[in-house]
């Protein structure tokens, strides 16, 4: 194992991963680490029952990771994420009747799993936005053509309304993409529940209300279920 560099603290570098600090967390002794790096260290140290600073080896409290890492019911470190209840669980929670039949993931697997789902959903919505932009351009061309034919002025309000519907859909989907990408980038145990809620809110069947007035072919394309998003 590569020895931890004590002088890296002044450079804003995590002594564990040797990279720039991400979501810096300070131990009781004042040393800074990436939150993910320190969390993994705590999980490995939990087997011995003693958590020490990885740099100076002084005893530390697991509470340095924040309240999101401590079970509010049993005051013990959380170790699993329940997908059904979307709650962080400690060892005592795992044996409680309400969670016995639930599916739980380790914290590390949950973070990886939800980050991948958020990124996939974001990529899917970006494709939807591109398709909507293409449709918007088509509708604008139709409107321009109609404007050249005064005899067809009665059709202009409907075309203009369709463009407005598409513009609104693009705006709302763009906002969802921003939320998905930000949540994936900042995902930690404090935001796992929000990640599940966001995936539910951006599910294809939920998005139907965003563009109910679009042409049938495009609506079917956008609302088709992605592969396990």
From Swiss-Prot:
SUPFAM superfamilies: B-box zinc-binding domain (SSF57845), RING/U-box (SSF57850). Its EC number is 2.3.2.27. A zinc finger (B box-type) spans 66-107. InterPro entries: TRIM/RBCC, Znf_B-box, Znf_C3HC4_RING-type, Znf_RING, Znf_RING/FYVE/PHD, Znf_RING_CS. Belongs to the TRIM/RBCC family. E3 ubiquitin-protein ligase that plays a role in the limitation of the innate immune response. Mediates inhibition of the RLR signaling pathway by ubiquitinating RIGI and IFIH1 receptors, leading to their proteasomal degradation. Also promotes the neddylation of IKBKG/NEMO, stabilizing NFKBIA, and thereby inhibiting of NF-kappa-B nuclear translocation and activation. This is E3 ubiquitin ligase TRIM40. It comes from Pan troglodytes. The lineage of its organism: Eukaryota, Metazoa, Chordata, Craniata, Vertebrata. The gene is TRIM40.
């Amino acid at each position: 194992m590569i020895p931890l560099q004590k002088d890296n603290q002044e450079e804003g570098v995590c002594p564990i991963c040797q990279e720039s600090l991400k979501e810096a967390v300070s131990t009781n002794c004042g040393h800074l680490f990436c939150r993910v790096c320190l969390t993994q260290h705590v999980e490995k140290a939990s087997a011995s029952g003693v958590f020490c600073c990885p740099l100076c080896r002084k005893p530390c409290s697991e509470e340095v990771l924040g309240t999101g890492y401590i079970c509010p019911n049993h005051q013990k470190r959380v170790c699993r994420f329940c997908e059904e209840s979307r709650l962080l669980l400690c060892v005592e929670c795992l044996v409680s009747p309400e969670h016995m039949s639930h599916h739980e993931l380790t914290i590390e697997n949950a973070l990886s799993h939800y980050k991948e789902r958020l990124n996939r959903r974001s990529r899917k919505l970006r494709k939807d936005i591109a398709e909507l932009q293409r449709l918007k351009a088509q509708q604008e061309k139709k409107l321009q053509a109609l404007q050249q034919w005064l005899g067809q002025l009665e059709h202009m309000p409907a075309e203009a309304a369709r463009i407005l519907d598409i513009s609104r859909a693009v705006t709302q989907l763009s906002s969802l993409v921003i939320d998905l990408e930000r949540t994936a980038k900042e995902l930690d145990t404090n935001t796992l529940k929000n990640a599940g809620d966001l995936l539910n809110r951006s599910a294809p069947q939920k998005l139907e209300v965003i563009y109910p007035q679009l042409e049938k072919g495009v609506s079917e394309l956008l609302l088709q279920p992605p592969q396990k998003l």
